[in-house]
C-alpha cells in the first residue's frame, strides 16, 4: 500500500481544510487538548467516552459507532483525516476503529498535532458542528483484531510484538511511567514476545520513519515476516500504532491488534508470563 493511501502531509492538510467530503478529526490521549485549540474545522472524538462501551470492557459496537459518526456529521463516503498529539498515538487507535468498521477512506495526518505546531500552522478555538448524517458501519472486521484465546495459542508460534516501554516489558512497572501503576494483576510480558516500543517508529517531529528504516527496526528485533503477527501494549492503543506501521505502511497482511493487551493478559489466572528483558 502506498503511503499516500493512508497518510497525508501537513501541506496537503492545510490546503484541503475546506475541501468537500474531507473531515478532519482530532483524537488525543489528553482529551482536553482539542478544547484549547485544534485545526480549523476539525471535530473531536473522545477515546474514553466516544469509542469505549460505557458498561462492559469493549469498544462501541457497529450500531453505536454508526450513531456516533452520524451525530458528528461523518458520512460513509467522506475521507476522514485523523490526527492527534504524541506521534498520533490515539489517532492511530481511532484509525484502527474506522478500519474495523469498514470505513474505506481514512488516513492519518503524518506528524499529527506535533508537526502541525512545530511548523507554526494555525489553530482555532472556534466550536465546530457539522450537519447530521446517516452513517452505516459495516460488521466488525475481526481479521485485524486478536482475542485472548488466539494470543495464548500464538505463544512461540506467531510473532508477538510488545510495543510498551522496556520497563513495562521487563516487569519493572505496570503502565507508562506517567500513569497510575494499576489495572493488571501481574507485570511482565507474554513469553516469546519481542519488544519494539511503538514510538521508535516515529521521527522527532512525529512523522513516520521511512519504510526502509521501519523494516530494519523490526527485522533487527527478530520479526519473522513469514509468520502472522499480533501486537499488544497495555490497552491496545499504542499497539494500534504499530499495527498501522506493519500493515498499512510495510504491507504485512496478517497483522492483528490485541486490544485486550496487558490489562487483560496480565490478570488472567494461569496465563504464562515472563519477566526481564
Swiss-Prot record:
The lineage of its organism: Bacteria, Bacillati, Actinomycetota, Actinomycetes, Mycobacteriales. Its EC number is 2.8.1.1. Substrate binds at residue 238. GO terms for cellular component: cytosol; peptidoglycan-based cell wall; plasma membrane. Contains two rhodanese domains with different primary structures but with near identical secondary structure conformations suggesting a common evolutionary origin. Only the C-terminal rhodanese domain contains the catalytic cysteine residue. One of its GO terms (molecular function) is thiosulfate-cyanide sulfurtransferase activity. Keywords: Repeat, Transferase. Signal peptide: none annotated. Pfam families: Rhodanese. May be a sulfotransferase involved in the formation of thiosulfate. InterPro entries: Rhodanese-like_dom (IPR001763), Rhodanese-like_dom_sf (IPR036873), Thiosulfate_sulfurtransferase (IPR051126), Thiosulphate_STrfase_CS (IPR001307). The active site is at residue 233. Residues 18-125, 154-274 form the Rhodanese domain. It catalyses: thiosulfate + hydrogen cyanide = thiocyanate + sulfite + 2 H(+). This is Putative thiosulfate sulfurtransferase.
